[in-house]
Each structure stands twice: as C-alpha cells, then as structure tokens.
Curated annotation (Swiss-Prot):
Subcellular location: Cytoplasm, Cytoskeleton
Main location: cytoplasm
CDD domains for the chain: ASKHA_NBD_actin
GO CC entries: cytoplasm; cytoskeleton
Record's protein name: Actin-3
Pfam families with a match to the protein in the record: Actin
Taxonomic lineage of the native organism: Eukaryota, Viridiplantae, Streptophyta, Embryophyta, Tracheophyta
C-alpha cells in the first residue's frame, strides 16, 4: 500500500469558512480548519516568541486576540491570492505533511467562478507548488456525485455563499445556476444581533465563534414558522440552555428557529432576495422543460448551512407549494453533507476513468493557464 500512498491524489475543498483537505480514496477529509490568515496587530509585543509574520487556520484562531484575521475567500470566490497561497502551503506542509510536487491535486471551485480565477489557481499549483497534475471541479457537482447521482439539482450552502446548481448527466447547466449571498456567516451575524437585543454582548471575532457554535448545536428550521412562534410564546418546550466559556448560561428559545428561518425568508434581515426554496424552484424553471422532472425528484442538499434539523421537510413543503401539483418532489439530505463536496472529490479523483482527465504539468507548460478551460468543465 505504501507504493500507492506515494502517488495518492490530494483533494482540497476551499470554502469561505473552512478548508477540507485529505487524500483521494479516504471517506473523510484528514484536515478541516478555518480558512483564515492572521497577522500580528502589533509587532514585537511578545519578546523572544519568534513571532511569525502570519498564522493560518486553527493557530490563527487560537491567537486571534493579538492578530488581525482575514478570510481570503469571500462568497466562495478567492479574493486574496497571497493569503490563499499561505492557506495552500499550510494545507500541504503542516496539515497533510506531503510534498505537493509528488501528488496530483484536485481543487474545488464555486459555481460561476470567474475564468481568471480558475487560471490563477492552475498557475499557482503548477508554478508555486510544482504539482505533477491538477484538476478543478465545481463544488456542487462533486456533492451530487457523492450522493450517487449524475442528474439533479444541488442546493449548496456554506459559510459565505449559497448556490442552486442544476446538473444533467454530470454537467452543471451554467445558465440556470443561481447565487444567493446568504449563508452561514449571515446566520451567525443574525443570531449575534438577536442575542445583543437581549442584552448579551458578542462583538469580537472570538465571540462570533461562540455564537457560531451555539447556532450549530441548537438552531433548527421549523416546518411552520408562525405556528412555532405561537408555541414558543406559550410553552418552554423549545427552550435550550448553552454554557458560555466563562460559565455563564444562556437560555435560548424562539431564537433557535428564528435564526435559520432567514434562509427561507431573507426579508427578515432586510434582503430583497428569494429564499432557498424559491431560488431552487427558479433554478429548475430556467432549465429545459424535459429535464425538470428529474431535477424535482433529485434535490440534493449540501454544505454546512444545510445541516439544520428540519431543513429537508421544510424545503420539500415549500417547493411542493411552488411546483406543478402532480410533480413528485424529493429532497435528499445526506448525513455527511457537511463534507459531501470533499467526499465527491475523493471519489472522482480515485476513479480509474478519471486518470486521463488530469491536467498534466507538460500540458500546462505547453498551453499555459488557459488549459484549465479546455480540460475542466
């Protein structure tokens, strides 16, 4: 097995909030860490600490008190390439402990990623990291593969952006992809705001992490929002407690379902866009009438912001109300959907039929970064 391990492809899913990285063929990523780069706010405070000029991931998170944190990926798209390079370097050398020049690398990208961005990713892999081969795959397509399908519509909602991506026979249909700039980070912000109204203060990036954890542990999506609000007013059934790091205990009730309801009703935070259910429906309606039935019957949820209990039932209910009455609607919420993009990449990169799909270093040297548009689609 040691032989095979040497040339095992690496799979790196770069999300706005978290990086998921590991080896093709594994059933889960080996490394999951925050997509952040932190730089010291004040130089030379800690004498003799051998201070680095930048920290990445968990280390940046734990030293956040003395750092300025930056997220190089905004709304799913890389916006700061120097920091992105630091994240990849950290992924290969510190997290996976591999030499990137010895492994093919499969990277993921957001739907509708600008062409220049795909080229830049390709260039950095070959020129900075000297990878022998690489490939760029669309995140939602990998999630669909992970669910064992090649046709369906994926609602992929992470920390920084949500997309609805209709896929037919393995190919995303670009004209029908819709983007919703409402995702996990906005929900965390919303919960911070609700808690602030109640007299708690959460302002720093450290405190935001606490609220994110609270959201992940306690929030859920109600099947009937209005009815749930009524229930919450009269009974304590929805109340749960959460202990803060300092030992203080917070009780949250209606906030548990008010927070993620925003995904269905963005108007709650003053956004004029349609919710996740309507965006999914609109995406389907942009597709050819002949394939809609296949899409309605294969609505696949993916990404950390689809992890809320109750989301599949609510999506099913809302889309059923929008779709033709005779239409069979099926919403699939795979239990591993938090990592299904990565898992799909792991599956794809280990297929024998995929091996001719890689962009090889020689092809890159001959054609330059634009090779990515010819080989990855």
């Amino acid at each position: 097995m040691a032989e095979a391990e040497d040339i095992q492809p690496l799979v790196c899913d770069n999300g706005t909030g978290m990086v998921k990285a590991g080896f093709a063929g594994d059933d889960a990523p080996r490394a999951v860490f925050p997509s952040i780069v932190g730089r010291p706010r004040h130089t030379g405070v800690m004498v003799g600490m051998g201070q680095k000029d930048a920290y990445v991931g968990d280390e940046a998170q734990s030293k956040r008190g003395i750092l300025t944190l930056k997220y190089p990926i905004e709304h799913g798209i890389v916006s700061n390439w120097d920091d992105m390079e630091k994240i990849w370097h950290h992924t290969f050398y510190n997290e996976l402990r591999v030499a990137p020049e010895e492994h093919p690398v499969l990277l993921t990208e957001a739907p509708l990623n600008p062409k220049a961005n795909r080229e830049k990713m390709t260039q950095i892999m070959f020129e900075t990291f000297n990878t022998p081969a690489m490939y760029v795959a669309i995140q939602a397509v990998l999630s669909l593969y992970a669910s064992g399908r090649t046709t369906g519509i994926v609602l992929d909602s992470g920390d920084g952006v949500s997309h609805t991506v209709p896929i037919y026979e393995g190919y995303a249909l670009p004209h029908a992809i819709l983007r919703l700039d409402l995702a996990g980070r906005d929900l965390t912000d919303g919960l911070m705001k609700i808690l602030t109204e109640r007299g708690y203060t959460f302002t720093t990036s450290a405190e935001r992490e606490i609220v994110r954890d609270m959201k992940e542990k306690l929030a859920y999506i109600a099947l009937d929002y209005e009815q749930e609000l009524e229930t919450a007013k009269t009974s304590s059934a929805v109340e749960k407690t959460y202990e803060l790091p300092d030992g203080q205990v917070i009780t949250i009730g209606a906030e548990r379902f008010r927070c993620p309801e925003v995904t269905v009703q963005p108007s709650m935070i003053g956004m004029e866009s349609p919710g996740i259910h309507e965006t999914t429906f609109n995406s389907i309606m942009k597709c050819d009438v002949d394939i809609r039935k296949d899409l309605y019957g294969n609505i696949v949820l993916s990404g950390g912001s689809t992890m809320f209990p109750g989301i599949a039932d609510r999506m099913s209910k809302e889309i059923t109300a929008l779709a033709p009455s005779s239409m069979k609607i099926k919403v699939v919420a795979p239990p591993e959907r938090k990592y299904s993009v990565w898992i799909g990449g792991s599956i794809l990169a280990s297929l024998s039929t995929f091996q001719q799909m890689w962009i090889a270093k020689a092809e890159y040297d001959e054609s330059g970064p634009s090779i990515v548009h010819r080989k990855c689609f």
